[in-house]
């Protein structure tokens, strides 16, 4: 699959840093003039100093590349390849804005930073739509909408980066359609997970988050389900993405359903909601990030995955009974296909998955948990599998290093020509790009990077080519 201009490659810096320091080596894989080179986002810790560098290579199939000739940068939380034209480094800071800038490939195959920098506000999901890189999160709405108790409603916060014009805009939350409260008609507020362009529209999973302080009090408390009032927090507590306030009902009361919002455009002003009770909500979770689980394929069909993350909830009432699975919205339709459902857990010894990525044809790469999802359990995910949506098969990937040696994967693979290229960071050696044959699910070792971490890979064309 060669990703087009509107496609997205997103790379989250979630990999563990290799515990031992390594020495930097030289480049033996120089860029060949006339080729469209690969770009690799790397990080190295040498002599107690951490350096981030964007590297180039003429192939990912073999060789060794060092950090010496890379473009040093400040690093990023997400590296977004906007097709093969621009590379954006988005920085996420918990609760705050982070600095974002973009890069291009010059005619001489060197990389350079573009002039504009942006302070992008916090986000929990990211995607592309038309000319934009688009991020969203859910946060406090405007003071003008405060209730009689002074509680603020939750609103959807949208940021739009116009990649050609190098401009950055945010939404006006005074516009009522951005309210996240009672989004699904059950009183709960939502956050969006995934931004997938389907034709001229945006498909996104609407993930119910429970009742905010505002939602608990709304309409005399009508949205608190019978028998659930004891779930309302009596004091503030928690930390990070698990923080809560006194008077809110944290996490959804409706874990056994999945909603998809279909928006007309980036304004989110007009939407259609569709629901299925075959799967739980469609989002992978890691701290405050909501991983995309909704993907359009080359055929136009849209597949919606649920890892059933709600199985980890402490209270049984908020714990889903549905296994991790996948449903489909057929090309040209805006309804779930009632005939299509695949139980992923049944094919994976009861295990679920943390991430999914579309890699071409009817194939998806899945990052599988090592054990079943349970409450209060520390989960690791060091196995990969190929899911064929048309054949409804799940094939474990072979040929990877031993699980005990893997400390993480690059957050988004690069796919072309039936092959999937994914960075693998190791505890006992340099990280490397592994090449997975999407048909056979066999992985082979490719390019080695003399660094401590690879956070992503993609391709860029020279700007005037």
Question: Where are these predicted regions, by residue range?
Answer:
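Acidic/polar, low-complexity intrinsically disordered N-terminal segments immediately downstream
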Residues: 20-177, 192-194, 198-207, 425, ...
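Beta-propeller fold detector
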Residues: 62-75, 109-120, 165-185, 270-280, ...
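Short coil/turn segments that connect the beta-strands within blades of beta-propeller domains
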Residues: 84-85, 130-131, 199-200, 299-301, ...
